[in-house]
Amino acid sequence: MKIPKKVRRYCPYCKKHTIHIVEKAKKGKPSELTWGQRQFRRVTAGYGGFPRPLPDRSKPVKKIDLRFKCTECGKMHTKANGCFRSGRFEFVEK
């Protein structure tokens, strides 16, 4: 799927249509100090198996999460109807 790098969209902060720069959301660095991660380390420590069943399979394509950055106010927002699935994904100049 080909998506333009710059699109004209409605900015909910400016409350008008402006040019937006389209970016793909990147995965953040996971925190080792969250409660779930601490519990997981405690359970998997020592002898014994994995504490929960392993996932059988993954989906064939991942979801694409797009972020739109307004060129006037600089604020970023997401698509109203969320992200979508796409096998191939690239930005193109319009």
Curated annotation (Swiss-Prot):
One GO cellular component term: cytosolic large ribosomal subunit
GO molecular function: large ribosomal subunit rRNA binding; structural constituent of ribosome; zinc ion binding
Superkingdom to which the source organism belongs: Archaea
Co-factor(s): Zn(2+)
Cofactor note: Binds 1 zinc ion per subunit.
Biological process, per Gene Ontology: translation
Keyword Zinc-finger: yes
Keyword Zinc-finger carried by entry: yes
UniProt keyword annotations, A-Z: Metal-binding, Ribonucleoprotein, Ribosomal protein, RNA-binding, rRNA-binding, Zinc, Zinc-finger
Zinc finger regions, C4-type: 11-73
Homology family: Belongs to the eukaryotic ribosomal protein eL42 family.
Subunit annotation: Part of the 50S ribosomal subunit.
Name recorded for this polypeptide: Large ribosomal subunit protein eL42
Organism, as annotated: Methanocaldococcus jannaschii (strain ATCC 43067 / DSM 2661 / JAL-1 / JCM 10045 / NBRC 100440) (Methanococcus jannaschii)
Gene: rpl44e
